[in-house]
Amino acid sequence: MIKVIPNKKNIGAEIVCDLRKFSKEDLKRLKSALYKYGVIFFKKQNLSSAMYLKFAKNFGKLANYPRLKGLSKKFPQIIVVQRKRTDKGPSFGEQFHTDSIYTKKPPRFTMLLSKIVPKKGTANTEFCSQYLAYKHLPTNIKDKLKTIKGIYSSEG
């Protein structure tokens, strides 16, 4: 059984459940919440790498990242993103971005599993809805956007 708690902002919902055991009906509700709210959050989950990937496969084919080293040969799709206090320079993915958008066939969904979470306000991962952003644009800008193309690149 899952419980869906919509975020008070315009995007996202917290899902209360145990991801180690859920039914087909629960999965339908998870997917429905994902489509409705754009991003879903699961707090206090204790998943092994194998359980994490098993859960991820419910949402489609797993992506490989040829430029990034996976956790291990057994789990190449799990990319460890970490920053130590002693690290210098820009953080991986610190600027606004859409995961994997630069690939030929980007995955429909992205998952992030936090093992160590910094104190609130010290390092924030934020989410936004491009659907809502577009919806609130003036008509003249929407019309202009229909005539142009964007090129995505991870080259910088």
Identify the role of each PLM range.
Residues 2-156:
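Non-heme Fe(II) oxygenase catalytic core, chiefly the N-lobe of the double-stranded beta-helix
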